[in-house]
């Protein structure tokens, strides 16, 4: 495949056209009066969204050089989304402003390396100042404000705040599509895993089709149980106590399963068998989690423990266990709180070390199950199109809220960036480095300017007034009033604002120091014979 190469000014100009096309499509969504963008889908209804990263990922341009520029900015949105989960539109707006301003100066003869140094210096100062003015998030109300601003919906803000209150800041909050029109919250207390009963004959509540065990003993093993003789000694001990038994094993089958079912039907005693969750090493870890939560032990030959010699002291306890066809929920395990805390810290340490997104998700899930529970937000809407859009907004709001809990909040609506303006302007720099600082100064005005423009106002007027206002005072584009942003509940997570600025600066610096661009040369369509081979072009 032949390649086409463009150099210096020509290369940067071609890429800038791509940057502008993508950024112009994304930035119309910024602020409380931002518009939506409609994305064509090959199958199903089109997607209507105001989520920056979703729009950026969809854009592919025909010209390969323009496309490279667009992809660079899409990378800013994507990276910000990965780190902070929101702020992707702000990051795109900042990147476009830095690239455009930087390119003007490079064209006028400035040294890109000097500009890069200036940009990096200015961003470092801005980030330090953002951290200094950041306020920790306190109480349910603050959480609701952050979520409501991100989702542009107060009801969603309240739902997310309630979910975080119920399952804690480390709890898992998942999104599901609801069958109805309303969006509601469902909280699963205790530990739940996706394995149901081994036989429907084990159910105790025929109406709900579930087995409910009150104050049961819990046998946890990684072995397959097919011979009833293996578990007979422990069954006899449990029967003497007059309590039900939950068996979590690799599998329960054959004679063992039949005996448990027959005794349940006769009313002799109640035992419910479920398969162990997970696979391989993850299964071992999850069984250990369950054992610690319930105060039991994992009966495993690897640990030198045999089923036949198991006593009642090795079994776990819980106040209640509910087993459905698909899930098992253990409520109020009787484990030692110190051991549970130590296990949680161990999982946190693993979380910090892992680089795999999949592993991270699984570890967070385990952490939440030990820490207190899982909240499910069931998203409802009138149409499929509205449902997709609403789900994306709630996802952003959820990420935004987590980021706020982590690093605190700053004034929203682009005000925080304007509040660091004077600190950045005071940086002492010379020559091209000073130009780099000025580029960042111009860029941090851009989010406010764009929010105002999307609200149908003159952005420059708002920006100039903001420079002379006291820190924290900003423009509420939703109402057209000047207010104390934090008191009015218009806030952004510090992590989101910081990540947007850092990622935009990183890509802008790379862009400005680009001197050559290599792309595949488009193949020319030779035309002529369009028939099948050996058919002489006739069809």
From Swiss-Prot:
Compartment(s) where it occurs, according to its Swiss-Prot or TrEMBL record: Cytoplasm
Amino acids binding ATP: 29-32, 86-90, 413, 476-478, 492
A biological-process GO annotation: protein refolding
UniProt xrefs under InterPro entries: Chaperonin_Cpn60_CS (IPR018370), Cpn60/GroEL (IPR001844), Cpn60/GroEL/TCP-1 (IPR002423), GroEL-like_apical_dom_sf (IPR027409), GROEL-like_equatorial_sf (IPR027413), TCP-1-like_intermed_sf (IPR027410)
Catalytic activity: ATP + H2O + a folded polypeptide = ADP + phosphate + an unfolded polypeptide
Endpoints of the signal sequence: none
Pfam families registered for this protein in UniProt: Cpn60_TCP1
EC number: 5.6.1.7
Function: Together with its co-chaperonin GroES, plays an essential role in assisting protein folding. The GroEL-GroES system forms a nano-cage that allows encapsulation of the non-native substrate proteins and provides a physical environment optimized to promote and accelerate protein folding.
Subunit structure: Forms a cylinder of 14 subunits composed of two heptameric rings stacked back-to-back. Interacts with the co-chaperonin GroES.
Family, similarity comment: Belongs to the chaperonin (HSP60) family.
Protein name: Chaperonin GroEL
Organism: Parageobacillus thermoglucosidasius
Gene assigned in the entry: groEL
